Amino acid sequence: MSNISVIGTGSYVPNNIITNDFLSTIVDTSDEWIRTRTGILERRISKGENTIYMATESAKEAIKNANIEANDLDLIIVATLTPDNFMPSTACSVQKEIGAMNALCFDISAACSGFIYGLEIACSMLKNSFRNKALIIGAENLSKIVDWEDRNTCVLFGDGAGSAILSKTKEEGILEFHSGSNGLKGEHLTCGVLKANNTPNKNDSLEKNNFIKMNGKEIFRFAVGAMNETIYNIQEKTKWDLNEVKYIISHQANSRIIEYTAKKLNTEKDKFYMNLDKYGNTSAASIPIALDEMNKRGLLNKQDKIILVGFGGGLTFGGVAIVWSI
């Protein structure tokens, strides 16, 4: 049976930068308060770019990086909790925009774990069918579901998209997954129906349950536990020692979660790649944006062992062990 490898990455973030200082003009907060509690300095907020546009731009980059044509794609999966439409799916809209007319397309909703879930689904579908290449996208326009009057949540989130292209290969690539869900704790991170318009300057007069609501303490506890469990299980399946792993690329939610997880794992914080200071929490987009940034910066070399790990609303969690092949 063929192996599955990552052969290309791409990403897109809006040009519009919202700093902590700007947020301090619309809610009772400060740069120091946000920075020390989250590690976030700024985030990108869409100015007209919708989820389809951001997903499409990241897909174009990934296709170019993989040195393939859009028609080479057999599968497109978009992980998002902020679609522009319920139908057609974001994946079908991306298919239209990039001209990937040979691809089977669908969306999944698993919040911040969505990209990991997408990778696992794609790997299974590639291994068990005639399909050879898949495009996995995490794309979010979270600014439209943020309560810009709630300082506990509006400081956390940003917009963006990231993509990865998978292909059947002979060389070692994606090795093992560990994933799961805990719907019993779903109430700790919720969002109702989507809003049509929402800006950092004012909220439209809709019910507050249309926005992201989060029990921060419970999510912190869940995140640290889920990350530790996931990494431990991946180590068990791969027989990797953490010293062999070059990077752990986790969901970019909060620097304290990452620092605490590193401490629990008895490993250095620098093993965890972080870019949340620039982008905030972009949900399903955070891991692929980080992966693409690392790829562009030349931080990953062939045969490097890396672990991707995510957690989020649902509640959901998941991780994957990858031998880098680009």
Swiss-Prot record:
Region ACP-binding: start-end pairs: 252-256
Residue ranges of coiled coil: none
Any Pfam family hit: ACP_syn_III_C
Record function comment: Catalyzes the condensation reaction of fatty acid synthesis by the addition to an acyl acceptor of two carbons from malonyl-ACP. Catalyzes the first condensation reaction which initiates fatty acid synthesis and may therefore play a role in governing the total rate of fatty acid production. Possesses both acetoacetyl-ACP synthase and acetyl transacylase activities. Its substrate specificity determines the biosynthesis of branched-chain and/or straight-chain of fatty acids.
Protein name according to UniProt: Beta-ketoacyl-[acyl-carrier-protein] synthase III
UniProt enzyme class: transferase
Catalytic activity as recorded in UniProt: malonyl-[ACP] + acetyl-CoA + H(+) = 3-oxobutanoyl-[ACP] + CO2 + CoA
GO BP: any one term: secondary metabolite biosynthetic process
GO CC annotation terms, alphabetical: cytoplasm
Entry superkingdom: Bacteria
Keywords annotated in UniProt: Acyltransferase, Cytoplasm, Fatty acid biosynthesis, Fatty acid metabolism, Lipid biosynthesis, Lipid metabolism, Multifunctional enzyme, Transferase
